[in-house]
Amino acid sequence: MNPRKKVDLKLIIVGAIGVGKTSLLHQYVHKTFYEEYQTTLGASILSKIIILGDTTLKLQIWDTGGQERFRSMVSTFYKGSDGCILAFDVTDLESFEALDIWRGDVLAKIVPMEQSYPMVLLGNKIDLADRKVPQEVAQGWCREKDIPYFEVSAKNDINVVQAFEMLASRALSRYQSILENHLTESIKLSPDQSRSRCC
C-alpha cells in the first residue's frame, strides 16, 4: 500500500469588511461561531489537515482584513496562494458590488497570472431575513467568471465545509498540474542534447 502524498496549500479568504470571513474560517477549522464581531487587522492564519483521495492536505488559510485602508498591505498576503475564497454578505449589496475589485486585487498578485487560479464565491449570512443580493444575481456573476458559488451560513454551519473542500480540491488539481508540467519540461531534451554526436 502506498503512503499518502502530503501537500501544503496556501488558501486565502477575501472580501469586504464585516462579511463574516473570520466566522467562516473558524466554523470550518474549529466548528465554532462567535457572536461578537472583531475586525481582522492585516491577516491571521489558521491551519487544517484534511484528506482528499490519496493525499493529505495541510491547508494554511489566511484570513485577510477587509478594511479599505489596509487593502494594499493585505494584498501582499495573496502572493504564493494556491486558491481563494471570495466572500460577501447576502444582506449587504455593497459587499457584493465590491467583488470585482477584490477578485482583481487577488489576480493581480498571482504569479504567474493564470486563468486557472481556483476561486469559489461564498454568499454568507443566508440565515438572516433581510437579504439584499438575490441568489440568481450571485450565480450569474459566478457563471460569467466560471467560479463555483455556495450560499453559506457561518452561524448555522450551512455549506461551509463543502465550500472550503471544493476550493481545496481545485487547488490540489492545479498544484498537481503545475507539478506535472514542471516535471515534463525538465525531462525534455534541449536541441543540442537530442542530436547524437560522434567522437
Curated annotation (Swiss-Prot):
Domain comment as written in the entry: Switch 1, switch 2 and the interswitch regions are characteristic of Rab GTPases and mediate the interactions with Rab downstream effectors. The switch regions undergo conformational changes upon nucleotide binding which drive interaction with specific sets of effector proteins, with most effectors only binding to GTP-bound Rab.
Coiled coil region boundaries: none
Superkingdom in the source lineage: Eukaryota
Chief localization: other
Pfam family membership, one: Ras
Functional summary from the UniProt entry: Controls vesicular trafficking from endosomes to the trans-Golgi network (TGN). Acts as a negative regulator of TLR9 signaling and can suppress TLR9-triggered TNFA, IL6, and IFNB production in macrophages by promoting TLR9 lysosomal degradation. Also negatively regulates TLR4 signaling in macrophages by promoting lysosomal degradation of TLR4. Promotes megakaryocytic differentiation by increasing NF-kappa-B-dependent IL6 production and subsequently enhancing the association of STAT3 with GATA1. Not involved in the regulation of the EGF- and EGFR degradation pathway.
Lipid attachment locations (S-geranylgeranyl cysteine): C198, C199
Protein family: Belongs to the small GTPase superfamily. Rab family.
GO molecular function, one term: GTPase activity
Tissues where the protein occurs: Expressed in heart, placenta, lung, skeletal muscle and peripheral blood leukocyte.
Membrane topology recorded in Swiss-Prot or TrEMBL: Lipid-anchor
Short sequence motif named Switch 1, residue ranges: 28-41
Alphabetically ordered keywords of this record: Cytoplasmic vesicle, Endosome, Golgi apparatus, GTP-binding, Lipoprotein, Lysosome, Membrane, Nucleotide-binding, Phosphoprotein, Prenylation, Protein transport, Transport
Residues engaged in binding GTP: 15-22, 34-40, 63-67, 124-127, 154-155
Name under which the protein is recorded: Ras-related protein Rab-7b
Motif (Switch 2) on chain: 67-82
